[in-house]
C-alpha cells in the first residue's frame, strides 16, 4: 500500500524545567537546577516542525499533559481542591512534587510503540502506550498519553490504541525510543526490532525490559526481533537505543558500539529486507556520540527522494562529530542531506530531534481518519506559535516550582490550548 510517515512531535509544555530527575541521563544531571525557558523551548520545537512541513512532510503534534500532575498527586493521598493538592504535595514531599511538575512528555518517542499496519496481525496501526515505569516522573505520563492517543487515533477501523503494560520493572517500557522498523518502504511489511537494555537477571536495571517488547509484539500480532543494547553504550549514557541508533525504511544508522550482537541484528535485517543498508560510525567515541546526540537525529525519506538527517545544532559544534556527518553524507547510502535544527532547550534535558517525535506510518484511508486538529497546516502552526508566545512562561527556576503563581500561569496556558483545540 501507499503509506505516509507522520511525525507527531510533542508540544513542549509550559512547565518545562531542569529539575534533574533522570539518573543515567547525562544532560539532565549536568543541567539540574539551571534556568529553563519554556517559551523558547516550545518555539524551538515548533520551528523544527515547520522546517519539515516546508519540505512537504506531514507533521502532527501531541499536546502536553497538565502539570503539576494533580491526578497523580490526588491518587497518592493529597486531598482537597486542585490548588490544595498541589500546595500540600509541595510542602510535604518536595521531591515527589518536583517529579509531578516534569514536562518530560515532550519526548513523544517515549509515548508509545507504533506497529505499522502491514506488520500487525489485523491490518491496523497499533499504538501501545508506554508505561515508563523506571522513572517516577515519567510514570505519571501513561494515563494522559493513553487518553490523548485515543483522541487522535479514535477510528478503530484503522487504529488500535492499547493502554500501558503493567507498571512494573518486569515490563518496563519506554516506547518507540527502543523500537526500530526495517522495511523496503513505509507501506510494506517490515521487521520490527525491539532493543532491550539488559539481559534478564543481570545486575543492571531493565529500563527497557525484553518482556515489554515481547508483550507489545503479541498485542499487535507482529513478528519481532529482540536484541540487546550494548552495556558500554548504556554506561556511557545511552539510556535509550535512539541515542545510539536510528532507522528509516531499509537504512539503519548506528554507532559501531550500539548493540551487543551487531552481527545477529544485521543478519536478521538482511533476511527480512534484502536491500538492507547498515551505516555504521566508528570514527567517534560514544562520549562524542552521546554529548552531540548525533544518532538522536530524525532520519526521514524526502518527498523528492533520498533521505535527510535532522540533526541538533550541537553536532555542528563538535568538529569530530561534524566530520562523521560529512562522511555519512558522502558515503554509498541513501542519506544525502543534513537539516540542522536548534532544539537546545530540549537537548539540555537529554532529548534531541528524534526524542521529540513519534513516527506513525499510515495508509491513505488511515490518514484521513486521524483527528485533523492534531495535524499541522500553516494556520494551525501559526496559532500554536501565537499561543505559546502569549501564554508560556519565559523562564522557570527549578528551585521555584512551588510558587503558586507558576501553577496558575501553567494552568492558564493549558486552558488556552484547550480553547484553541476546540476551535481549530
Swiss-Prot record:
- The UniProt entry annotates the active site at 174, 240, 355 (nucleophile)
Q: In which pathway does it act?
A: Amino-acid degradation; L-arginine degradation via AST pathway; L-glutamate and succinate from L-arginine: step 2/5
Q: InterPro entries attached here? A: AstB_sf (IPR037031), SuccinylArg_d-Hdrlase_AstB (IPR007079)
Catalytic reaction annotation: N(2)-succinyl-L-arginine + 2 H2O + 2 H(+) = N(2)-succinyl-L-ornithine + 2 NH4(+) + CO2
Question: In the Enzyme Commission scheme, what number(s) does this protein have?
Answer: 3.5.3.23
GO: which molecular function terms? N-succinylarginine dihydrolase activity
Question: Which Pfam families does the UniProt entry name for this protein?
Answer: AstB
Q: Where does substrate bind?
A: 19-28, 110, 137-138, 207, 242, 349
Any one Gene Ontology BP term = arginine catabolic process to succinate
- Residues folding into a coiled coil are none
Query: Could you tell me the keywords of this UniProt record?
Result: Arginine metabolism, Hydrolase
Explain the purpose of this protein. Answer: Catalyzes the hydrolysis of N(2)-succinylarginine into N(2)-succinylornithine, ammonia and CO(2).
Family in the record: Belongs to the succinylarginine dihydrolase family.
The UniProt subunit note reads as follows: Homodimer.
Write down what this protein is called. N-succinylarginine dihydrolase
Q: Which organism is it from?
A: Rhizorhabdus wittichii (strain DSM 6014 / CCUG 31198 / JCM 15750 / NBRC 105917 / EY 4224 / RW1) (Sphingomonas wittichii)
